[in-house]
Amino acid sequence: MSASPAERPAGLSVFFPAYNDSGTIASMVIRAVQCASELTSDYEIIVVNDGSVDSTPQIVDELARTYSHVRVVHHPKNRGYGGALQTGFRSATKEFIFYTDGDAQYDPAELADLWAKMTPDADLVNGYKISRSDPFHRIVIGRLYHHIVSLLFGLTVRDVDCDFRLMRRTIFEKIDLEKTSGVICLEMMKKITDAKFRIAEVPVHHYHRAYGKSQFFNFRRLGRTAIDVFKLWFALVIRREHQKAGAVTGQPHAR
């Protein structure tokens, strides 16, 4: 596929937040290189190694030596999923930014479907899972989470928490990301919605996690997430801090 948004060559940044993904990150990066090179000649692949303690750092450094379009940003210590996303958005230099996780539960080749949907009438193309290939309890918790936060935050997208997104970098001239935990996705979608950016949606496949384990689905993390969601709801829905004058800095940053 050679066509690009607005029927002209466009720059594309692809990034992966990676934490202990040594079993999957190489295949994800190689697949992303193959897909991105078919979409545009102006692309970069970025891996944000979020303080991994397995062989992820060595693997991604070798990928960067092998592929000229690949570069790596290392966090000396784990900053959390939100911290890794913030680094990825800051590091991206191209007109369009795509990200997904490094655990191979999504296929980077489906970026082509999002790219085709990125017309002049869209600012963000959000993937939504056709079906979720997870254990039953994770599916139930995921659906409950989606319905609860959609109601609390007034969101209408089909899948708030699908980390398979293509967006214009101009979005970050108007929104500022602050969260370092997994609720950064909720923060991002709420702020994008409130800033009146145009959202398109595309179905994507979700695959069984063949390597490693989720950092989200344990009771301690679920409790922490509930607290983070409440704090975010109070800040964005009750106080509407992001819509007050001077609240937008235009750069994602950690707090």
Whereabouts are the PLM-identified features?
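Donor nucleotide-sugar binding loop of glycosyltransferases
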Residues: 21-24, 52, 81, 107
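A conserved acidic beta->alpha catalytic loop
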Residues: 49-58, 104
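N-proximal low-complexity "stem/linker" segments adjacent to membrane-targeting elements
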Residues: 1-34
